[in-house]
Each structure stands twice: as C-alpha cells, then as structure tokens.
UniProtKB/Swiss-Prot annotation:
Protein name: Nucleoside diphosphate kinase
Record localization: Cytoplasm
Gene: ndk
Gene Ontology BP, a term: UTP biosynthetic process
Residues that bind ATP: K11, F59, R87, T93, R104, N114
The reaction(s) this protein catalyses: a 2'-deoxyribonucleoside 5'-diphosphate + ATP = a 2'-deoxyribonucleoside 5'-triphosphate + ADP; a ribonucleoside 5'-diphosphate + ATP = a ribonucleoside 5'-triphosphate + ADP
Length: 141
C-alpha cells in the first residue's frame, strides 16, 4: 500500500452549510491526515486556471461561477491510497446517485453544488496540491 497525497476542496455550498468539521472528521476517521489546509475565496482567474481541463466543456462557466460564489476549504490529505479512499468517501458526483453515508449523499444538493472536490489520479493530485500549496506549506505528520 502506497502513502499518497491528494487535494480535497470543500466547496462553497458545504462551507455555507457550516459542515467543514463534519466532513473533515470523516477524512480523519478513515485514516487520512490533513497535512495542509486553508480557507480561501477563489478569484475568477484562479478558478478558471484550476479547472482549465474543463475549459471546453459546456458546464465550465457555471462551475467557475459556483466555485467563486463563496469561500472554499482546501486541504491536502495524506495516507495509504489517499486518492481512492477520498473518492470513496466523497461518493458519486451526482448526490442522487451517491451511496448512503458518503459525503455527497449526506451534504450535497445537486450535481453542481456537490459539496467536495477530490483529485482523481496521482498526476492530477500532484498538480492540484502544487496549485494551492507551495512545498513549504505542506507538513508531514
């Protein structure tokens, strides 16, 4: 089993519902450690850069508008198979299809306002962590 790092974003809808702590406690209960974290309000430019992979997709503008609608809680999670573990905890992108007990089933309202983002592969995790955190701002625990 490999120790990995992955990026997790608690999106504006979940921040507004004041469930940051409830979501973070699920990561910790699953054995993931938070090795970096911050609350930020993304600018349009930052959101467009972060989601540039979706630039040509029809939902891009709505995604960016949503991600700048309020603060987000950005964190780096570390642990064995952190990427897959985080994705399992999040549940399906559409909360209506998410398994009961997953973060999205419990806290998300729609496929757009779906509470959390998580890296989908080691390469994207490395890029996403670097986007938000310089190396000196991530701490082994």
């Amino acid at each position: 089993m490999a120790i990995e790092r992955t990026l997790s974003i608690i999106k504006p809808d979940a921040v507004a519902k004041n469930v940051i702590g409830k979501i973070v406690s699920r990561f910790e209960a699953a054995g993931l450690k938070i090795v970096a974290a911050k609350l930020v309000h993304l600018s349009r430019n930052e959101a467009e850069q972060f989601y540039s992979v979706h630039k040509e997709r029809p939902f891009f503008k709505d995604l960016v508008d949503f991600m700048i609608s309020g603060p987000v809680f950005v964190q780096v999670l570390e642990g064995e198979n952190a990427i897959a573990k985080n994705r399992d905890l999040m549940g399906a992108t559409d909360p209506k299809k998410a398994a009961p007990g997953t973060i999205r089933a419990d806290f998300a309202d729609s496929i757009d306002a779906n509470a959390v983002h998580g890296s989908d592969a080691p390469e994207t995790a490395a890029n996403e962590v670097a986007f938000f955190f310089a190396g000196l701002n991530v701490y082994a625990r």
